[in-house]
């Protein structure tokens, strides 16, 4: 197969950052994505509806296409049910994000104990606002490769049981444990999967030298977990959909003694997913994963127009502009076999 026409996809998890980076991140995100769930972990975080709408306007100011950002509230111990109701009424905010405090980039203001937000989760269940979850515990005694599994066992399973009417997305899943949990849960639980977790495992990051641009959170796992993710993404299950978790950091912040977590894939998101699906002999499953399952779960219409993927190898630039700096993308300087036609 050398040509694919797909309903325009959406990205159900992306980091656009802010300030002078926005012009570059919005350009890449909006090149062929119809919509994107925009992460709220700015500095300061997007904790109010007012802040979310202001961020929406900053993003739209840099968009020359019909690209539509879907906004997310950042949950803290102090988030109120009234804020949830205001978010739902805004028409711009579609979800709220649970970051366990300290779990990832700019998450220090996150939730210290999920019991602190049970009133908020009840309001979300009543209002129909989705809960997005970074599923890792933060206990320093827990091995970093086990933090997703422990979070599911100790925290998420209880939330799912206590709020059966709450739609929950376990974001950027990385383990067989997460796949099994999502598959066994009700129709109100789904998951996003990144392209880099489908294409790579921890050997790519650590064997033969440390490759900092593969360092992300949740961290890449062993290849058995990678295979479980591939099986889930290509299974045809409606519970799994595209979320790049594309997370730009300036080159000097990645290539450092203590480098930041995050991989940049927005420059070639659909192309990278196509490679993963092609390797599994499942290109026929790509459209549902990229274009149908996400909007169906969110209760939004599917995009009406299409994009074309062609088998046309191209070389990824060594870097892309990121405001006054540069970002090194996944596959920098390497060949990608698929290309979205402009």
Swiss-Prot record:
Keywords: Hydrolase, Metal-binding, Pyrimidine biosynthesis, Zinc. The keyword Mitochondrion does not apply. Pfam families: Amidohydro_1. GO terms for molecular function: dihydroorotase activity; zinc ion binding. The keyword Lipid metabolism does not apply. One of its GO terms (biological process) is 'de novo' pyrimidine nucleobase biosynthetic process. The modification N6-carboxylysine is found at residue 97. SUPFAM superfamilies: Metallo-dependent hydrolases (SSF51556). GO terms for cellular component: cytosol. The active site is at residue 245. Substrate binds at residues 15-17, 41, 134, 217, 249, 261. Its cofactor is Zn(2+). Zn(2+) 2 binds at residues 97, 134, 172. It catalyses: (S)-dihydroorotate + H2O = N-carbamoyl-L-aspartate + H(+). Signal peptide: none annotated. Binds 2 Zn(2+) ions per subunit. Zn(2+) 1 binds at residues 13, 15, 97, 245. It comes from the Bacteria. Pathway: Pyrimidine metabolism; UMP biosynthesis via de novo pathway; (S)-dihydroorotate from bicarbonate: step 3/3. Catalyzes the reversible cyclization of carbamoyl aspartate to dihydroorotate. Belongs to the metallo-dependent hydrolases superfamily. DHOase family. Class II DHOase subfamily. Homodimer. This is Dihydroorotase. The gene is pyrC.
